[in-house]
């Protein structure tokens, strides 16, 4: 099963890497650039990240709405950043076509995105393939939609949430780890395919997983999880706060 998954993932990853470079894409000199977006006078923002393939990192801690570093060696992978009326889009413009296959061996596409912590945010991510590390624990998220094609991803939703969060993760041929909070209620509804699920620190009732704080805290994180093939690791963060909701005999 594991060998079959790795083979399928490899094939899908290569296909998505090829498609992500666009028609006629060629590996060239390594380029690095930084971009930032100021936060306008808005009460909330929507952020959409459209990433074809490579290595993606998203976290908080920015002084502006966005502080980003991009590294790539295919011209067609140069990202486009737009912002208007509270809507931020960071996108790889051309994800179609098949480039020179030989160049794919030296393919590099790396995005390091820092977002502002304090503004309420609806976040949408569409990731084709590769590795993604999403540390969202410090953001003021209201909604999260994450679509992952193939590869590996770690999503950190731990921390002290001050408002309810509605999240959805849809993964294809991927290995996914989700770190969950211990001191706010968590409810996960799973619609899975040929996926192995490890749920540490959660209680299972058919296709629903909950943590010890569910139904007892003022804030609830609700996660819908759709999976294809691969494995999913659901972990509740280690915290002394978890003991507050633990039942002792």
Explain the meaning of each model-derived region.
Residues 22-24:
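Bacterial signal peptide processing site
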Residues 116-120, 126-129, 136-143, 147-150, ...:
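Extended beta-solenoid/beta-helix repeat architectures
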Residues 18-20:
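C-terminal motif of bacterial Sec signal peptides marking the signal peptidase cleavage site
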Residues 1-8:
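Bacterial N-terminal signal peptides that target proteins for export
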Residues 41-65:
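Post-signal-peptide N-terminal segment of Sec-exported extracytoplasmic proteins
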Residues 31-40, 68-72, 77-82, 87-104, ...:
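Short, surface-exposed interaction patches in beta-rich subdomains
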Residues 8-16:
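Hydrophobic helical h-region of N-terminal Sec-dependent signal peptides
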Residues 94-113, 124-126:
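A cross-kingdom signal targeting lumenal/periplasmic-facing segments of multi-pass membrane
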